[in-house]
Amino acid sequence: IAVSRRDIGDAQVGDCVAVEVTSYGDDTYHPQGVVSAALGENGTMEASIAAILHENGVFDVFPDEVLKQADAIPQQVDLASAGKRLDLRDKLIFTIDGDDAKDFDDAVSLEKLDNGHYLLGVHIADVSHYVTPDSPLDSEAFRRGTSVYFPGHVVPMLPFALSNGICSLNPNVDRLAFSALMEMDASGRRYGARFSKSIIRSKARMTYNKVNKILAGDKGLREEYAFLVETAEKMNDLAHALYKRRIERGALELDIPEAEIRVDEAGKPVEICFRERGESEKLIEEFMLQANEAVA
């Protein structure tokens, strides 16, 4: 495609660009076009990601009206406008995510009841409190549909002020959530469930790696997180019971290895390996399944 010098915009020699065809030419002329976007120096990680996003209609930049609405949302919970909610801030609730996770949208809890049963809690960030129907944020989230993840890079469905801020269940701060509270015995049998808008305060930002090491007996981590070790062990026991019950019911288990692309500090891929799936990953999987089954 031939592009005139006057139609290259801000692009530089060696850049990766997107070109809009203005004429497809004929037997004697090449197609003609104009540079519609300069995506960065060709061959770099940034340009490669930008090209994939552009090709698939995914936009890294949010419209001004969306950012304006997001920036106007306070980064602290306003109890006066939160409405009637179940106050769970004194409960031992914590998140478990990957080492590189920046947004924490779910948390878990487990407590022993007087009748010997357990109360399993799955707490999901209440984004709907901040993203109201037909607002600019709502329309943009609907248009995007999902967050798009690359190794070392994410294009969020919602601006970072929400996804990494007030809608992220960060530790030691109040957050609005929607909680599924399920009563079950040690064998994983569920006796009932209730659902409520809630306010929580996560007590720790845990990672799969740390919880796996705690469950494996890592002395240093067990001392550092002594306040949740017993709960983590009981969670693991319950997760095993839930898995056993699920398999006995005829669940189809597709334990397919997941590839993990590791990048260096510059964001360049340096290794492709199988993602390890330890006890904590399975624990979260079982608890989320329980919450979904209870809701259904």
Residue ranges and their predicted role:
Residues 118-131, 282-293:
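Conserved phosphate/anionic-ligand binding catalytic regions in large, soluble enzymes, centered on
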Residues 227-241, 277-294:
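Conserved pre-motif C helix in the palm subdomain of viral-like polymerases
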Residues 147-248:
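Conserved catalytic alpha/beta cores of large enzymes that bind or transform nucleotide phosphates
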Residues 50, 64-68, 86-89, 192-196, ...:
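Short coil/turn segments at secondary-structure boundaries
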Residues 1-121, 128-173, 212:
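Charge-lined substrate channels and their catalytic hotspots, especially those that engage the 3′ end
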Residues 1-5, 23, 37, 220-225, ...:
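Short hinge/gating elements
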Residues 246-270, 286-294:
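Core structural elements
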Residues 112-114, 184-189, 263-267:
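Short acidic-glycine loop/turn motifs at beta-strand connectors
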